[in-house]
């Protein structure tokens, strides 16, 4: 399962790397003349209810794969050749209108073998858009469009604004994957329409959006509305997206899901990211760059109002975590570290990668936010997944309705009055200058915000760290002001049991003299080395 997942995600991620950049060809093939896309067949009445009925009908019928064997020249494209194929600006959907938004399409080839049908919706009527080889510039691919089937189809699409036709702000490409950016303009983590059996003992399933319906916006609209029809061996679904382009881009999503079979682990609103090396985990720290990650932590706002921060890791083995909840208020994968000096990468700009925050629109009931961390040696492999898993397994014949909002930007749209964690550092424990008699592991956790800046200026104030561990023992526990960050640093050592290399779950927060919390809750999982590898130097 992991090899299949690794191959699948690595191929998709590699393609995203290219399409996350501005069009290298710029306006080289842009013209003032706009060529309207050819339409297929007759327009038909369309709305979200009709799409849900179609998804329900799909689920009632046997599944069939839409993957096709592509013409040999497309199959043999290298990565560089494929990414040089660009949709022509003069063929962009809505380029012949005064709408604020435009759509450009991705070509099939390389890793993308499943045609996705594209429809335009105008005044409640949908009509399919025809693939046209002449709508693409084939760059250095060695192709010229001649000889390609007229009904080849598209792989996906991207959204631009009329003011910036070279850089997209959202894109849908590969299975049910999509991405967006905020004002930073830098792609990073992905979202998916649905996750099926991620991190389970069996093979993971990757549902596909098999059709998109793009609703023509009015000239003054700041929101573009689109719909997606999803299908896979175990489930079908209908989606409605309302995408508002802003400094923090917002997607308002409604989904209706229709299982074909019982699903072991259903993932709602999945976020997919990459974490290779960070301040707290340098297991893969042979790269010259200090840190390599799209996001550095999972942020939770639970149904009972608790704020939780869980730093990410690149584990030695697959790691799976469940955070039980009832009607969660939100969760997401965040990139809190925004300092270029911590990454030193002027090519992919990890410090500009967007956070992705999931906000349920109504009560989701009982279930859990689940976090899957997969070992990776390679930053082109997305190894982090977080999603909501309903407590009850879906069964055939059900209709499952989930509404939520996705926010893409430098910060999530919600914040707590409590202080928050800005850094987690780890290393060998002990007292500097004294010979170590046994193995321990040091944790240094920095908190800023809330009341901490004011408290840090008062010398006689008492701030108490509250620390819990599932095994082992804590040593040298302290919480002291750190004026350089206008906050507090908590430090402690963990001494593992001599006869156990089992993971240790750690829970930490700061409280005042009245027992009131001053910070969010910091959670961590540490896997101590086996006894033979516990070097004390």
UniProtKB/Swiss-Prot annotation:
Predicted to be exported by the Tat system. The position of the signal peptide cleavage has not been experimentally proven. It comes from the Bacteria. One of its GO terms (molecular function) is catalytic activity. Keywords: Periplasm, Signal. GO terms for cellular component: outer membrane-bounded periplasmic space. Pathway: Glycan metabolism; osmoregulated periplasmic glucan (OPG) biosynthesis. It is found in: Periplasm. Residues 1-30 form the signal peptide. InterPro entries: Gal_mutarotase_sf_dom, GH-type_carb-bd, Glucan_biosyn_MdoD, Glucan_biosyn_MdoG/MdoD, Glucan_biosyn_MdoG_C, Ig-like_fold, Ig_E-set, TAT_signal. Its main location: periplasm. GO terms for biological process: beta-glucan biosynthetic process. Belongs to the OpgD/OpgG family. Probably involved in the control of the structural glucose backbone of osmoregulated periplasmic glucans (OPGs). This is Glucans biosynthesis protein D. It comes from Xylella fastidiosa (strain M12). The gene is opgD.
């Amino acid at each position: 399962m992991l090899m299949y997942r690794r191959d699948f995600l690595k191929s998709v991620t590699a393609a995203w790397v290219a399409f996350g950049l501005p069009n290298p060809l710029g306006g080289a093939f842009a013209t003032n003349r706009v060529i309207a896309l050819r339409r297929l067949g007759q327009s038909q009445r369309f709305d979200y209810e009709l799409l849900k009925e179609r998804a329900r009908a799909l689920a009632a019928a046997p599944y069939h794969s839409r993957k096709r064997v592509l013409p040999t020249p497309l199959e043999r494209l290298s990565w560089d050749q494929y990414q040089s194929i660009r949709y022509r600006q003069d063929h962009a959907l809505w380029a012949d209108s005064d709408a604020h938004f435009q759509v450009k399409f991705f070509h099939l080839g390389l890793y993308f073998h499943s045609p996705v049908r594209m429809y335009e919706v105008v005044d409640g009527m949908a009509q399919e858009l025809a693939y046209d080889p002449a709508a693409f510039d084939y760059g250095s691919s060695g192709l010229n469009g001649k000889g390609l089937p007229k009904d080849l189809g598209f792989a996906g699409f991207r959204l631009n604004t009329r003011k910036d036709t070279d850089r997209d702000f959202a894109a849908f490409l590969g299975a049910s994957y999509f991405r967006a950016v905020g004002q930073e303009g830098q792609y990073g983590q992905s979202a998916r329409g649905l996750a099926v059996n991620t991190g389970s003992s069996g093979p993971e399933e990757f549902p596909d959006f098999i059709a998109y319906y793009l609703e023509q916006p009015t000239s003054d609209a700041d929101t573009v509305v689109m719909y997606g029809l999803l299908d896979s061996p175990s489930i079908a679904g209908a989606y409605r997206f309302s995408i508002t382009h802003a400094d923090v881009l917002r997607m308002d999503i409604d989904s209706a899901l229709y299982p074909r079979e019982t699903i072991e682990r259903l993932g709602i609103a999945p976020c997919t990211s990459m974490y290779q090396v960070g301040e707290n985990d340098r297991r893969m720290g042979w790269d010259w760059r200090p840190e390599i990650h799209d996001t550095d932590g999972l942020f939770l706002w639970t149904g009972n109002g608790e704020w939780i921060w869980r730093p990410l890791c690149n584990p030695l083995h697959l790691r799976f975590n469940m955070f039980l909840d009832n009607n969660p208020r939100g969760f997401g994968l965040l990139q809190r570290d925004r300092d270029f000096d911590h990454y030193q990468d002027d090519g992919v700009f990890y410090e500009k990668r967007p956070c992705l925050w999931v906000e349920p629109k109504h009560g989701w009931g009982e279930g859990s936010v689940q976090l899957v961390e997969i070992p990776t040696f390679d930053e082109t492999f997305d190894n982090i997944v977080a999603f909501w898993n309903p407590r009850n397994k879906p069964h055939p014949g059900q209709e499952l309705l989930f509404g939520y909002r996705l926010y893409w930007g430098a910060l999530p749209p919600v914040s707590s009055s409590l202080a928050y964690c800005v850094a987690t550092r780890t290393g060998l424990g002990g007292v500097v200058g004294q010979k170590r008699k046994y193995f321990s592991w040091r944790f240094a956790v920095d908190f800023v915000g809330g009341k901490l800046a004011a408290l840090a200026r008062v010398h006689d104030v008492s701030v108490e760290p509250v620390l819990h561990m599932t095994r082992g023992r804590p040593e040298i526990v302290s919480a002291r002001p750190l004026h350089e960050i206008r906050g507090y640093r908590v430090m402690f050592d963990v001494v593992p049991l001599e006869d156990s290399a089992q993971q240790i779950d750690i829970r930490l927060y700061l409280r005042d003299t009245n027992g009131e919390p001053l910070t969010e809750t910091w959670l961590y999982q540490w896997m101590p080395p086996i006894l033979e590898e516990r070097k004390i130097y």
